[in-house]
Amino acid sequence: MSTNRYAIEIGKNGGYEFFTAFFNNSLNYNRFYQKIPQDTAIDIVRANIIQPNQEFLNNKNIERHVNKNNNLDTKKYNVVLIMIESLSAKFMGKFGNTESITPNLDKLADDSIFFTNFYATGTRTVRGLEAVTLSVPPTPGSSIIRRPNNTNLFNASTIFKKAGYDISFIFGGYSYFDNLNKFFSSNNYKVIDRSDFSSEEISFSNVWGVADEDLLFKALGELDKNYKAGKPFLSLIMTTSNHRPYTFPDGRIDLPSGGGRNAAVKYTDYAIGKFFEEARKKEWFKDTIFVITADHCAASAGKVNLPVAQYHIPLMIYNPHILKPKQIDNLASQIDIIPTVLGLLNLPHTTKLWGTDILNFPANRAFISTYQLLGYMKDEHLIILAPNSKAKAYQLSGTNQYEIDDNVGNLTHEAISFFQAASSFYENGELVEKSF
């Protein structure tokens, strides 16, 4: 008899249980994926996420205190995080594109802390938003944003709210899409979406949302309100224009509305340029850290199960008054964004986030995934966990990957540990916000 739990379950019920789970947004890790003892998994995770400026609060989970750097000032800078729909790294001139469709983003990269080896955790907007807000590795099935028991979770807003920040999620579409309204409103975010735009504030819209320029102009007004209220702010802005049918206002760029992906990318780049042109005039600009990244790539299909190049996205952290431009080539992932920003703020805090400060303590690893496949990248290797087999190891070489014998056992255990622990923490309610 097979010792593989997946094979046993399929043998018992002809796949009913697996496919029921599949179509209900959740695949139970313990039932369908390779495991190691839970205590061992948690110990491995703890060893991999602890930073020299942190100490654990107990010996059973990842709760830890983050100390400030006494050699640096602490200041509550505003944080504006712009997630651009489907902005693959390959669209930018900084990554070798020769079609001149991202002139504003390329200039921004030159003036920013620019991360060249940065990866999305998944292939859907909700997976990217999950990674950035919760700073948690992807779990099997759908994003936590679309699953039950996702309210009052420990997330970026938990830390910023305690520090006195006003917190908002600004979206160009209707936030009932993919359960965004429920998730964000029940996790400390004020939600501003398409329903909050007056007709005068919309120059163009399509099925996905208002034009990116309208969204970003609306965001400027909201940030002005926050500044006038005298509170620092954390604002997460999600664009929509770089999405089929790729339509946008006429007369903005030299490519036509509906002209395909390149046209939509260039339009979004135009809107970003206009946003920063206006933002630089604001009194709050010099005290605001801007983070620009993508939710996921434009495509995820490839000749292999997890084509690494189809998860490669840009990350820029920008403020010309306080941050010196530089290029960072360390491997990193969307779950590292908020811990890195908190490192720049130098705010002491208690955390349950899974990411690391990649400017000061880079982990040099990344997480990628589909609905079923879970990938862990480190040391030029990719470990893939699937619900119907043991973990497989691949050697990475440029954009190519080659399956190898499992001679990277420690790395395989790391991969299993992160995905197993993250899944069990979600299932057991350990991602929930608690008083420290």
Give short role names for the model-derived ranges.
Residues 1-77, 109:
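N-terminal secretory/membrane-targeting segments
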Residues 50-436:
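Solvent-exposed soluble domains appended to multi-pass membrane proteins
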